[in-house]
């Protein structure tokens, strides 16, 4: 007999405002437990030091988490000038201390280097894998392994303030950009060294900052539900964003209700107005219910590519 998953069949996205000092996986497991979800996944880890936006996908939304992983991000970062650490942040050991003689003109000149598309070598203290192991595991053992540089794009890099030896920047960048590495590289270019002391992710894709919720707020809602003797989901589920917000950047094709059966069977269907190899969101009926993604194949047909499982919301045993 097949084993049924624990938790509810609940689909949606929680915009978690992660606290500092916790891993992204710890935060993920707390959210999963608060919502009593049968399945959950995050969309790109934040360092324990970092705070801010960590979209948590529940249920069928996990099928589309890769699109958020691939999306642009925005960060507010404060760097301490004059000290370089082995991890490029304040969680590491100081390995070099130098005087800070940074003028605004020098800073503006060096910041300009990072704007646009450049090559970046990932930090050894990152989750990127080498021969199946995260780089940080090698780093903790004092082993340095080869890393290939990879292209990143910094769309915006805005100077916020320089107070004493602390520099604050606003950075809008492509996926896979290591902010710690930018700060470490900038410190070397300035001739004084630098490391991250505060990092906050303020945006993922187009998700609004004001929709974020903390673990403390979720816990408070759970306690409120217990006090009022109501089901926790009545207070918590309204916080969920629709799962198709993860793929909002793709065009939508709306099909009549009669086509639902064929789509869910994975059959390619006639659809007008699509370009070859174009990935689209598929919605059904006047209510525009999202059922998954599709792509135009070589025969000029829309082929379902990633479909959700349609289920009722009864809790699993």
UniProtKB/Swiss-Prot annotation:
GO terms for molecular function: RNA binding; tRNA pseudouridine(55) synthase activity. It catalyses: uridine(55) in tRNA = pseudouridine(55) in tRNA. Gene3D superfamilies: Pseudouridine synthase, PUA domain. Pfam families: TruB-C_2, TruB_C_2, TruB_N. The active site is at 47 (nucleophile). GO terms for biological process: mRNA pseudouridine synthesis; tRNA pseudouridine synthesis. Disulfide bonds: none annotated. Keywords: Isomerase, tRNA processing. InterPro entries: PsdUridine_synth_cat_dom_sf, PsdUridine_synth_N, PUA-like_sf, PUA_sf, tRNA_psdUridine_synth_TruB, tRNA_sdUridine_synth_fam1_C, TruB_C. Its EC number is 5.4.99.25. Responsible for synthesis of pseudouridine from uracil-55 in the psi GC loop of transfer RNAs. PANTHER family: PSEUDOURIDYLATE SYNTHASE TRUB1, TRNA-PSEUDOURIDINE SYNTHASE. Belongs to the pseudouridine synthase TruB family. Type 1 subfamily. This is tRNA pseudouridine synthase B. It comes from Shewanella frigidimarina (strain NCIMB 400).
